[in-house]
């Protein structure tokens, strides 16, 4: 069978290994497996959301309110914007896909950092667009601008992942706003802020505000309920932009693109500030332990504004480290697919991190 040509160039996105795989392959009891590979919230779903899901299960036979009125109103109030400046997606990934299908094509280019979220390239290639990357693996706005100015007539979409996944670095928000002002109004700047809650907690200067983003004619802010709000399995994301951008992307959204349980979970999670605060407090207390461990063991790391930390290695190979840890029942994220000898580790609870340090120290001896 003949398929579209762009598929020849595409690779499958490599998701973090599931707990079930470790149970099957290594015979380890599920309760003894620690998954720190996919940047999920280590505290699991909040109690308030759990109770809401039990209640909403009775209505699983009903389609959700496709206007997502209550969720949009909650987000609008939180961010100081109107609900008309919001779009809801099945994860923020879906809105990335909308943005590219709205703006990119075979005659255009898409610009991103040297190492960043893999789905940008995967979705961009579906449109036939040319991929431009900075030479710097981390975000360097001067280099972004240099490449953009050299290919201004071609580049239709720019992705800034702030904080950046899978490395964790971030840039001051004021620098980001200045950058957008240097970009032509017909080029869409996508600000993927999936970890913005973490960046804001660590350093308020890194907080990108949706209320500022909507002032630009050519920018969209993306957020998610997967990380700080612990709803990775619910798949709820959102975009915030001016009404022209939201109107265009909404034409690509199928009806009922999130589920009735997902919608209720997101509405309840949005109001659970206590849970989010607990998440942030634990994250950066435990992050300090990882930084101390790295320094004590001569491991290079990237200062992180997220819920993960990336360790860079000379020896041994990251794939060897991850495989040995996997056999111990600890799932980490090998970054060899990004051409890095590095391991990304989600910040867990204290007891989970204790096991990581114990096992990793043995491997590195």
From Swiss-Prot:
EC number per UniProt: 2.6.1.9
Cofactor(s) listed: pyridoxal 5'-phosphate
Keyword Amino-acid biosynthesis recorded: yes
InterPro entries, A to Z: Aminotrans_II_pyridoxalP_BS, Aminotransferase_I/II_large, HisP_aminotrans, HistidinolP_aminotransfase, PyrdxlP-dep_Trfase, PyrdxlP-dep_Trfase_major, PyrdxlP-dep_Trfase_small
Any one Gene Ontology BP term: L-histidine biosynthetic process
Pathway noted in the entry: Amino-acid biosynthesis; L-histidine biosynthesis; L-histidine from 5-phospho-alpha-D-ribose 1-diphosphate: step 7/9
SUPFAM superfamilies registered for this protein in UniProt: PLP-dependent transferases
Entry annotated with the keyword Nucleotide-binding: no
GO molecular function, one term: histidinol-phosphate transaminase activity
Superkingdom, natural source: Bacteria
The reaction(s) this protein catalyses: L-histidinol phosphate + 2-oxoglutarate = 3-(imidazol-4-yl)-2-oxopropyl phosphate + L-glutamate
Entry keyword set: Amino-acid biosynthesis, Aminotransferase, Histidine biosynthesis, Pyridoxal phosphate, Transferase
Modified residues (N6-(pyridoxal phosphate)lysine): 227
Signal peptide: none
Pfam family name, one: Aminotran_1_2
Leading EC class: transferase
Assembly notes: Homodimer.
Family: Belongs to the class-II pyridoxal-phosphate-dependent aminotransferase family. Histidinol-phosphate aminotransferase subfamily.
Protein name: Histidinol-phosphate aminotransferase
Native source species: Campylobacter concisus (strain 13826)
Gene symbol of the encoding locus: hisC
């Amino acid at each position: 069978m003949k398929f579209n040509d762009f598929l020849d160039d595409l690779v499958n996105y490599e998701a973090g290994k599931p707990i079930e795989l470790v149970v099957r392959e290594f015979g380890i009891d599920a309760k003894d497996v620690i998954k720190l590979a996919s940047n999920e919230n280590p505290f699991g779903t909040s109690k308030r959301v759990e109770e809401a899901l039990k209640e909403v299960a009775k209505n699983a036979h009903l389609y959700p309110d496709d206007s997502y009125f209550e969720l949009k109103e909650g987000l609008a109030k939180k961010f100081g914007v109107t609900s008309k400046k919001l779009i809801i997606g099945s994860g923020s990934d879906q809105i990335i896909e909308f943005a590219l299908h709205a703006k990119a094509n075979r005659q255009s280019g898409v610009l991103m950092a040297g190492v960043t979220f893999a789905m940008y390239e995967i979705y961009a290639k579906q449109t036939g667009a040319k991929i431009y990357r900075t030479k710097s693996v981390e975000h360097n706005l001067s280099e972004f601008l240099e490449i953009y100015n050299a290919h201004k007539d071609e580049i239709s979409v720019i992705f800034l992942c702030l904080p950046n996944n899978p490395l964790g670095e971030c840039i001051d928000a004021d620098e980001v706003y200045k950058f957008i002002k240097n970009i032509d109004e017909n080029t869409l700047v996508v600000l993927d802020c999936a970890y913005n809650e973490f960046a804001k907690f660590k350093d308020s200067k890194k907080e990108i505000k949706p209320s500022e983003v909507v002032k630009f004619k050519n920018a969209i802010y993306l957020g998610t309920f997967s990380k700080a709000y612990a709803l990775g399995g619910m798949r709820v994301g959102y975009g915030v932009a001016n009404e022209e951008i939201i109107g265009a992307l909404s034409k690509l959204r199928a009806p009922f693109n999130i589920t009735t349980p997902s919608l209720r979970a997101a509405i309840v999670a949005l109001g659970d500030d206590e849970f989010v605060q607990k998440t942030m407090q634990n994250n950066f207390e435990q992050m300090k332990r990882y930084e101390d461990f790295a320094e004590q063991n001569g491991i290079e790391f990237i200062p992180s504004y997220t819920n993960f930390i990336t360790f860079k290695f000379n020896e041994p190979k990251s794939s060897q480290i991850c495989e040995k840890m996997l056999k111990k029942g600890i799932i980490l994220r090998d970054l060899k697919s990004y051409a890095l000898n590095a391991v990304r580790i989600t910040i867990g609870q204290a007891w989970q991190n204790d096991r990581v340090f114990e096992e990793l120290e043995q491997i590195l001896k």
